[in-house]
Amino acid sequence: MTAAVIVQARLGSSRLFGKVLMPLDERTVLAHVLERCAAIPGADVVCCAVPDNEMDNPVAAEAERCGAKVFRGSEQDVLGRYAGAAKWLGAETVMRVTSDCPLIDPVVCGDVLALVAQDGADYACNNLPPSWPHGLDCEAMKATWLARAATEAARPSEREHVTPFIRNHPDCAKANLAGPGGRMIEHRWTLDTPADYDFLCEMFRRLPRGARGWAWRAALAVEIGRAHV
């Protein structure tokens, strides 16, 4: 069974243009995301789904430099872009990760992926309801459900946000990976604003290098320590 991690990426963020190519600890944000995705247990391939326009050529080039496969598709119809990438890859299971989450955790993602690839759910995530820091969000689904959504979803919001059709469908067997409890959802580890960028730059200056820096517990320890400095 081919399990593909597909990362959506583009330059045209309305709140922070070009964020995926911004430097973070001597590499781009996108490079961090793709490296982490390549370490997800059970993943066979990592693909970056990039809009098919000239402005996003640098994003595609950076993804290729990082060793990811690149699929080009519609900028606005993100669902169609994902479905096209999954078909192109011959994927049976698809994991969705966004490119503004440079602290995405491979182990958490692997646990979500296993809920579909091994346990038989049609769709799985770790935010139904939210219980992890914002920035560790991931989703996995059977490619057949992704293809069905691409064919049947009609609302603009369903095309833009990829999975609402699947998440809301009564026939879809869903599973959720619950967080460790406490006040985890109050932590924000994603990149949408200049303030987020400043925070993440400080986080990466303090995180240990290499695989030890990937675990969400390491990021949490750094954030808690920073708050008490």
Model-derived features with residue positions:
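A conserved acidic beta->alpha catalytic loop
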Residues: 51-56
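Active-site oxyanion/phosphate-handling segment shared across diverse enzymes
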Residues: 141-226
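Glycine-rich, basic loop-to-helix element that forms the pyrophosphate-binding segment
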Residues: 77-84
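Acidic metal-phosphate-binding loop of nucleotide-sugar-dependent transferases
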Residues: 75-76, 101-103
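Conserved donor-nucleotide/metal-binding helix-loop-beta segment in metal-dependent transferases, i.e.
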Residues: 105-131
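A short, N-terminal amphipathic alpha-helix
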Residues: 29-46, 59-61, 65-66
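N-terminal nucleotide-binding beta1-loop-alpha1 segment
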Residues: 1-16
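Short beta-strand-to-loop acidic/aromatic patch adjacent to the donor-nucleotide binding site
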Residues: 86, 91-101
